[in-house]
Amino acid sequence: GSSSPGVAPADNTGPRAAPSSPSQLCAVCGDTAACQHYGVRTCEGCKGFFKRTVQKGSKYVCLAEKSCPVDKRRRNRCQFCWFQKCLAVGMVKEVVRTDSLKGRRGRLPSKPKCPQESPPSPPISLITALVRAHVDTSPDFANLDYSQYREPSPLEPPMSDLEVIQQFYSLLTTSIDMIKLFAEKVPGYGDLCPEDREQLFASARLELFVLRLAYRTALEDTKLTFSNGSVLDKRQCQRSFGDWLHAVLDFSNTSYSMDIDISTFACLCALTLITDRHGLKEPHRVEQVQMKIIGCLRGHMPGGGGSSSGAAPLQRVLGALPELRSLSVKASQRIFYLKLEDLVPAPPLIENMFRASLPF
């Protein structure tokens, strides 16, 4: 498979030809590995990830069953399983130089400062809080609901227009309820004035619906997984979503090719919510929260921390935000059309979307 741009530069280096023996492959992901790092033959990508994880004391969360595939192409998709694989093949944490040892080629500091005293654990980091907010409002992939799933079949009578729209409204409202919960868990959101919270949420809810749905949709998969755990065949959604579905799937392919990890994705969701919107009462306070999240994302991304090498991946991730806005407009138009058709009374949440003024 082709390597993902901007995520692990080490993937693009090294000879094109297959290594002559398995001993030249990375024990973690199978990529080309020139030599040993931290006790095991590993590639530069896995070495760098292991080192960063240990030095920063990062804690990861698996969204699935802690058995995600870890190979050259997919290792970035679950950092929890990637790190566990590093440990499983024998990479040694104790060999990684911490900040106090940097530049000393692994020699111990001349006077260790009370080695038996461990420093107090820092308060929960912003990035951890954002990942937790995302995980807590995402479906449990071990317990998905296939009760409404149907593959198109000539033997199966199609659903009526009425049923299709009812199903669509139900999926949309439960998803938006989950997005509301996500918003409330984003650090800093609750400190904003009530009017600005409402404005930010109303502006971002359809963008977040698209973003989260796209992230859960694998490239070659024929299924869509919604926030409440319901799984549908993509073709089941064609009638209710209309042309909007194609735009969502195109965006899904784009975001899949970026191959962003869960921490980056959680930051992207937060930045979709916490951003400058028309009519904010205290835009400066919103900007303060936004800058904290951007700083957090910059520090997390490979080559981040203000170095020029981190600019390209960061800009590419942030470049998804304007596209989300146009997809949100398409969504509003589609929902407005279904509401005008009036086959099914729109639930209050949908009705209220258009109460003040048309959002497109």
Swiss-Prot record:
Compartments it resides in: Nucleus
Sequence segments annotated as region (Disordered): 1-21
Zinc finger (NR C4-type): 26-46, 62-86
Domain of life: Eukaryota
Domain NR LBD residues, every copy: 122-357
GO terms under biological process: cellular response to corticotropin-releasing hormone stimulus
Xref: Pfam families: Hormone_recep, zf-C4
GO cellular component: nucleus; transcription regulator complex
Keyword list, A-Z: DNA-binding, Metal-binding, Nucleus, Receptor, Transcription, Transcription regulation, Zinc, Zinc-finger
Gene3D superfamilies: Erythroid Transcription Factor GATA-1, subunit A (3.30.50.10), Retinoid X Receptor (1.10.565.10)
GO MF terms, alphabetically ordered: nuclear glucocorticoid receptor binding; nuclear receptor activity; RNA polymerase II cis-regulatory region sequence-specific DNA binding; zinc ion binding
DNA-binding residues (ranges): 23-98
Subunit note: Forms a heterodimer with USP.
Family to which this protein belongs: Belongs to the nuclear hormone receptor family. NR4 subfamily.
Protein name from the UniProt record: Probable nuclear hormone receptor HR38
